[in-house]
Amino acid sequence: MSQTYLSLTVELPEEASEAVQDLLHESGALGLEVRDREAPLMPGVRGPNPGEAIIIGYFDERDTAESARDEVASSFPEAKLTLDEQPQQDWSNEWKSLIKSVHVGRLWVGPPWDKANAPAGTVQLVIEPKMAFGTGDHPTTSLCLAAVDAYMAEHPGAAVLDVGTGTGVLAIAAKKLGAGRTVATDNDPISVELAQENQAENGTPDIEVSGKELTQVEGTFDLVLANILANTLIELAPLIVAKTKDRLVLAGVLSHQRADVEAAYRNLGLTVLTGATQGEWVRIDLQR
């Protein structure tokens, strides 16, 4: 383990605090600190001014921290950003307190240490988050799980593609709800390895999990899921649309990014459906 970790400090208007917290979470932060003007601070630690928020994301990899910084800068150009290196702390148990189980439709999704609390009668997914995104508790994942639950109820046996699978949670949910061919891809080798571990843990060995590019994935799919960041969704739009036979579900999009993402896919011939929102996050549903 590295002897240092990185802290990304974000200073910006307090009305954007929740959205920034969600974005840092999605971008791979191991933990977040939100400084409150009402709470006592350590000597020498600056609290926010009136109308200001200070959010600090903690990372153990420089590439991840720098990528998160760039995403925040792109989405919140008014933010002041500071990336610092700090002495390493023991994160081995601290991050577990940040992970919560969720109950979405027929699905219960949670970490191994909370499995005993899963309600009877639910379709249970045990997801070990480690360093990949997607345990169910983040709004973007919950929004996608609801879409998977609804689609699979009406289309048993549907072929499903999960782009940017992270922990594999969406692909595993689809398979456990009755999907046919299920493919999960991610360009992060750590995510691929973890998704394969979660696949084995959940008894879904026939999901095709790999680091393949979309151009290497054969066939088209009834349901395509892509819970990644808005800029990447726009960049990959032609490839994602080419794999979509019926329904496309996009997430990882903040409300102010919605119009641009929808336009990219509408221009490729898809029809925008109602979708869903949770806080500052939106889910965009499209039809071939």
From Swiss-Prot:
Sites where the protein binds S-adenosyl-L-methionine: T141, G164, D186, N227
Pfam families: PrmA
Localization (cell): Cytoplasm
Primary enzyme class: transferase
Single GO MF descriptor: protein-lysine N-methyltransferase activity
Keyword ATP-binding in annotation: no
SUPFAM superfamilies the record matches: S-adenosyl-L-methionine-dependent methyltransferases
Principal place of residence: cytoplasm
CC annotations in GO: cytoplasm
Any GO BP annotation: methylation
Keywords: Cytoplasm, Methyltransferase, S-adenosyl-L-methionine, Transferase
The reaction(s) this protein catalyses: L-lysyl-[protein] + 3 S-adenosyl-L-methionine = N(6),N(6),N(6)-trimethyl-L-lysyl-[protein] + 3 S-adenosyl-L-homocysteine + 3 H(+)
Enzyme Commission number(s) of this protein: 2.1.1.-
Functional description taken from the UniProt entry: Methylates ribosomal protein L11.
Family: Belongs to the methyltransferase superfamily. PrmA family.
Classification via PANTHER family: ELECTRON TRANSFER FLAVOPROTEIN BETA SUBUNIT LYSINE METHYLTRANSFERASE
Record-given protein name: Ribosomal protein L11 methyltransferase
Organism: Myxococcus xanthus (strain DK1622)
